[in-house]
Amino acid sequence: MAERIVSPGVFTREKDLSFLPQGIGNIGAALIGPTEMGPAFVPTVVRNLGEFETIFGKDNQDFYVPYTAKQYLRNAGTLTIVRVLGLGGYSNDTITLGISGSGHAVAATLKPSRGASDPDNLEIAGPGSASLSDGGTKSSFTLTVQGTSYSLSFDSSSANYITKVFSDNPQDANKSLYVYSNFQNTQNGAGSSDTITIASSSDELFSFDYQEAATPYIQSQLVNSARTSLFKIRTLSHGSNINGKYRIGISDIKEAADVPGSDYGSFSLQVIVNNPGKNDDGVVLENFQNLNFDEDSQNYLPRVIGDKYTTIDSNGKLTNNGDYPNQSRYIRVSDYSNLTGISKELVPMGFAAPLNPHNVTLASSGGSGSMAFPTSSYLGTSADTGQLNSRGSYDQNAYYGLDFNNVDHQQLLAPLPTSAGAGNNITMSLEDAYGHDDASVLGSTYTDGSNLLTITGSDYRQLKFQVPFQGGFDGSNPAKARLTGTSIVGNNTQGFDLSSASATGSLSYIRAINAISNPDEFDINLLALPGVIHSIHSSVTNHAIDKIEARADAFFIMDGSHYSASIQTAIDDVKTIDSNYVATYYPWVKITDDVKGKPTWVPPSVVLPGVYANNDRIGQEWFAPAGLNRGGLTSVLEAKTRLTNLERDDLYENRVNP
């Protein structure tokens, strides 16, 4: 306790400094642009590079934000990221190839790649535009598309194997097609002389905005001849590539009678890395234990994992949805309204049929009948095959459910077109799976290899299954070119069209800028849009200027000119801008691309936020970054041009920083 000490004519007060007042939180920059993954349009604060990479992914040669974030976070501890994704989606044609010996099962699908003149509109499946030569077999067939013929094979040892002729990368610029889906197990199951068929199809529609990925409905055991749809799990990240990054495991399923002090059953839920053939495949990222469906319990599923998510309208207004804060870094619970008043005996025992990632019409030619996409199948559905590891031995840690090592099943982990249906896919239930004789090591109560699993008769360590994610979508055509560096043009920077205020890319960036425009909600002191250039993307940069001036508490580092701009052009490009909240720099600089490992030219805004962060760390905030200590560009190999004193003076006088 503070003590007051008194002496003649002098009064002093001793202050106890054991408890210091809480300081003001760090305020950092905001970066807007595309990233590999992460929540779209939701301003998200990261405090170190590891956190950034967990949420938004690592370096990507097509995007600038990851590089800029890495440089910035070396010198600062707070950074707000606003990821942009596509709006409106796309539609295009699909070539579907099947094999007759497998019941006309679909063997592969092809779509227009970046190499097509117009990937969104290339007609590849109309009358006469795609055809097969007569007599084509699995070993050798010829596909002709718009007058160009390709010698192909579904024999993986052939030099003409389909993925050796066509890439599976939609960004392939060398051919007009890429392999969208490749069902290798179906191909391997066909005979070498089985004939190849082709299906004509109309546009396949993905005409909607970006989406997160979701599991099929997790379903209960069979009660009165019916299964109850319980809940879904959704990813916090949006985008197409999130479908294949993770899978959900559900394990330790116990009936209520085996849970002391509860009228409800319980289970555990895991977030698992999905990366077949790699060292990290199967790594458990998160494990939530002893979950239940009792709304009054601290272990209530949505309460433990969380169900909150944020939506944003075209004006950038953010709306928070859900009741329980997210405790997971990867997922949230959704679609769980059926848990209200649920029968206490119900527990998760399977999931609904996965949806088909194609909705093409499959009337085939080159053979009889119609094609069908391969059907989902599940582990343990034949006698004594439950819980086998990759070596074929019993392993109590192995899951039932979808076989993620089956390459055909990996094709399910994809965006879902409009009106997607289950097709021939079927539901999965542990009650349709067999145990294993070696499960006797678990104790006296277990299910052997000749009997089906049950909630009452099986050991809880036998009751576990894994579930796929589907439906994550970038909101744009994956084959659209992603131009960077000196290739940036008005209608394409990193895959976004910013050529006018109404262009879809401009709408995405404007929505992201609006999201951080409220100073009462988001504290920032710096804004950068790496790769957005005022001279060719003025609809976006002018909007950013308006919002940053309205905030009046942050600074906008803006790229004024393209790589090719002369000094006079750089001056002319920004001469109408007179703002105390905007800075532009000249010229472009060369850095080392960490992904490609070679030098590349980038606009100044890619590197300058890191310089500002270093300046604020060793100098004073709001002091101009200058001199050898505070203005050094340590990551820059060279500038496009070495400026003379007179040229620097000319730039300074016209409000351009050299």
Regions from the PLM with identified roles:
Residues 1-658:
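Subunit-assembly interface segments of extracellular/virion macromolecular structures
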